[in-house]
Amino acid sequence: MTKKRVLIANRGEIALRIIRSVKELDMEAIAVYSDVDADSLHVKRADEAYYLGGSLPSESYRNIKTLMKAITDTKADMVHPGYGFLAENADFAKAVQKKGVIWIGPNPETIKSMGDKIESRKLISKAGLKHVPGQLKPSRTKREAT
């Protein structure tokens, strides 16, 4: 039986923590990296490292097209986004799932709902959870907003 392969769509300490967990679960960790991270510890500790190119995050860690190619090229079974970069991007989560790859994180609908303050407040209120008081609809005037 072949080991499951997890592509970690992040860098640095975040990626290192995920790599450690992936290996404890007896799976293969795939790091991704840009020009500036070529010698980073997360690249060295992973079972495999995939070069994304570029030095800016927009060219690498935030580039959905580039990350989707990495998923295909490495034959990853799962994707862990870490946090930041594309971890809260519903479109990235959808693209990963559409490809038939397991997304390790909230489903795209949850990501979208929790990214909208009013929608997330409505969901929390509906669930009966305690939260900071606030509006359940957008302000229409300056007076309503203050």
Which residues are covered by each model-predicted region?
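N-terminal beta-alpha lobe that positions the nucleotide/phosphoryl donor
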Residues: 1-146
